[in-house]
């Protein structure tokens, strides 16, 4: 049976580390907002039925994003944290579907990585990730406590892909226990699941600091040139 796949884009953050005058998802790269670049990836995929975008209720910028008028996109209001925004989005998604959660500020996702993730049919779900290649230090403040074994460490990326019903239940359980949910996989882990790691590309960066903009623009330019 063909699965119903829905994408969720939490886009209600303020992006304080960007030191910009507006939330980072509305900053522009190549004459489009970061959010538009991100949405285009999912709008172009034939297996994704709908995209639910969670925005802040007081956000004055999202009505100016023309792409959000697409009939394939539904807007919901986010919550106090990213996890609550994702949970709010799940309320308008059928429980028997699968959900792809992707950061609004990751505009450089490659279709090949997305396709690899969508091939997974394991109820424990899966996430894109990259193996740690730098030496990893555990710190106490700004002092090194020890060096960690990087051979077992991965950088979690998005999208993260789960059965909607199970992710919803995992988030509810985490909220009740006041657990800190940093990504969807962490909520699933708290509920005893072991999501799979799917090796993704390192250029699927999350724009977080001002210097990330130039790098993202470079990656997007490379993508454009390859299509010509």
Swiss-Prot record:
MF (Gene Ontology): 2-C-methyl-D-erythritol 4-phosphate cytidylyltransferase activity
Which reaction(s) does the protein catalyse, per the Swiss-Prot or TrEMBL entry? Answer: 2-C-methyl-D-erythritol 4-phosphate + CTP + H(+) = 4-CDP-2-C-methyl-D-erythritol + diphosphate
Residues at the site labelled Transition state stabilizer: 17, 24
Record site feature (Positions MEP for the nucleophilic attack), residues: 150, 206
Enzyme class, spelled out: transferase
Stated EC number for the protein is 2.7.7.60
Pathway annotation from the record: Isoprenoid biosynthesis; isopentenyl diphosphate biosynthesis via DXP pathway; isopentenyl diphosphate from 1-deoxy-D-xylulose 5-phosphate: step 2/6
The source's superkingdom equals Bacteria
Per the UniProt entry, what is one GO biological process? isopentenyl diphosphate biosynthetic process, methylerythritol 4-phosphate pathway
Instruction: Supply the CDD domains for this chain.
Output: CDP-ME_synthetase
Recorded hits in InterPro entries, A to Z, give: IspD, IspD/TarI, IspD/TarI_cytidylyltransf_bact, ISPD_synthase_CS, Nucleotide-diphossugar_trans
**This protein's UniProt keywords:** Isoprene biosynthesis, Nucleotidyltransferase, Transferase
What NCBIfam families would the database entry show? ispD
Record function comment: Catalyzes the formation of 4-diphosphocytidyl-2-C-methyl-D-erythritol from CTP and 2-C-methyl-D-erythritol 4-phosphate (MEP).
- HAMAP family from the UniProt entry: IspD (MF_00108)
What family is this?
A: Belongs to the IspD/TarI cytidylyltransferase family. IspD subfamily.
Write the protein's name. Answer: 2-C-methyl-D-erythritol 4-phosphate cytidylyltransferase
Q: Which organism is it from?
A: Actinobacillus pleuropneumoniae serotype 5b (strain L20)
